[in-house]
């Protein structure tokens, strides 16, 4: 990303942004994009070292960032963190759920156990409910805010081996629409970014372990599998980058997207067409 000098004219100038999963690939990229657009960023996640690494990158581009270790699956921990953010910064304008959870992909329905199916469905929906509820309490009081989620084209494209995660992504998109309906009268927007697989994310997210089993069944590495997918299955013959997804998050968190709520943003490079 390009380093900016903060002049108060960024898309998110003066905004307070909370990122859960802030130590991950997408969360870290979003932290940089938000900071470059003028937001004060609060990173939350389970691994302090990874959060600190992202925070150093944010500070290197002149951003203001704070770090807290938070388990997004624990309501009291997330609520307490939201309260601390408001004490420190006065408000919460944006919350991004960029959480990644380990789960099984690549097994056929016949092979998959109930727990393997349920783990991503329960984990991802639980986390988003907890995160959105904690932030929305303050957004309602202040008369506005933006709740951002992430999903994948698995939400709408069926295929063998992806049932649990596909259902989880569909549920996150449904939650986005219902949050928009619940909170719109209070000026709170809800947006979900539907991105296809991001090759760069293999380096610092749970996706390498998830894709490894799928790729191995085809005698491929995760990198080779994604390259083949990009060539065969996307209209643009490529997959999205971390920067592209992060910049989309910054835009939809900003006032320039103030007419958008309950929307699922297609960032699939054409692997799925609306």
What residue spans do the PLM features occupy?
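Conserved glycine-rich Rossmann-like NAD(P)H-binding loop of the short-chain dehydrogenase/reductase
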Residues: 39-53
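Short C-terminal tail/terminal secondary-structure segment
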Residues: 2-7, 106, 237-238, 249, ...
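Short, small/polar-rich loop/turn modules that mediate ligand/substrate recognition or access, typified
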Residues: 184, 189, 259-262
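Conserved mid-core segment of classical short-chain dehydrogenase/reductases
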Residues: 79, 100-118, 141, 161-164
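Catalytic loop of short-chain dehydrogenase/reductase
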Residues: 101, 148-171, 176-185, 194-202, ...
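Catalytic Tyr-X3-Lys loop
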Residues: 110-130, 144, 148, 172
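Conserved glycine-rich cofactor-binding loop
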Residues: 16, 23-25
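Amphipathic alpha-helical dimer-interface segment in Rossmann-like NAD(P)H-dependent oxidoreductases
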Residues: 83, 122-141, 180-181, 185, ...
């Amino acid at each position: 990303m390009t380093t900016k000098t903060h002049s108060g004219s960024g898309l998110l100038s003066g905004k307070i942004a909370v990122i859960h999963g802030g130590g991950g690939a997408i969360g870290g990229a979003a932290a940089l994009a938000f900071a470059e657009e003028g937001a004060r960023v609060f990173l939350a996640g389970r691994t302090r070292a990874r959060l600190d690494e992202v925070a150093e990158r944010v500070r290197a581009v002149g951003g203001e960032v704070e770090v807290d270790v938070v388990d997004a699956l624990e309501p009291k921990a997330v609520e307490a963190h939201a309260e601390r953010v408001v004490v420190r910064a006065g408000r919460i304008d944006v919350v991004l759920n960029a959480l990644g959870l380990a789960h099984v992909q690549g097994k056929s329905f016949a092979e998959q156990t109930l727990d393997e199916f349920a783990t991503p469905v329960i984990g991802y929906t639980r986390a988003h409910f907890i995160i959105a509820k904690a932030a929305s309490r303050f957004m309602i009081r202040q008369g506005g805010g933006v709740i951002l989620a992430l999903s994948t084209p698995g939400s709408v494209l069926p295929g063998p081996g992806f049932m649990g995660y596909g259902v989880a992504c569909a549920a996150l998109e449904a939650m986005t629409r219902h949050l928009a309906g619940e909170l719109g009268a209070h000026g709170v927007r809800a947006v979900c970014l539907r991105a296809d697989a991001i090759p760069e994310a293999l380096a610092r997210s749970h996706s390498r372990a998830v894709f490894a089993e799928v790729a191995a069944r085809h005698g491929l590495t995760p990198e080779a599998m994604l390259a083949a997918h990009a060539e065969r299955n996307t209209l643009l013959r490529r997959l999205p980058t971390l920067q592209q997804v992060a910049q989309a998050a910054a835009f939809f968190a900003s006032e320039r997207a103030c007419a958008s709520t309950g929307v699922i943003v297609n960032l699939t490079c054409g692997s799925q067409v609306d």
